[in-house]
Amino acid sequence: MSFKKIIFIFFLIFSNSVFADDKMVLGLEVYNNKAQCGTCHTLHAAGSVGNIGPNLDQLKPQIPQIIAAVTNGIGMMPAWEGILTYEEIEAVAYYVFNSTKK
């Protein structure tokens, strides 16, 4: 394998890792501060113990499910479309999914 290929592969792996870390940080920020999801939801990774909405640690929702719920609202949960950007909705979905998949 050529040196250029090794460098290229290393760059791809490293850049994806940095992007994922940024998405987790933004997701946590949205969860805890901008949308204050922990007011209603329990999520151990975020230190939240809400008891109105589903316990996300137990539910273990998938990313598309989270995006749909946050965007459109569900049950008592309000829709966040127009309040959060799509990037923020995607980041909070990524954060919740990765925090509960263990």
Show which residues each predicted segment covers.
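Sequence/structural segment immediately N-terminal to covalent heme-attachment motifs in c-type
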Residues: 22-43, 58, 72
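Short, non-ligating residues that shape and space the ligands of small metal-coordination modules
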Residues: 46-47
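Extracytoplasmic electron-transfer domains, predominantly the class I c-type cytochrome c fold
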Residues: 50-102
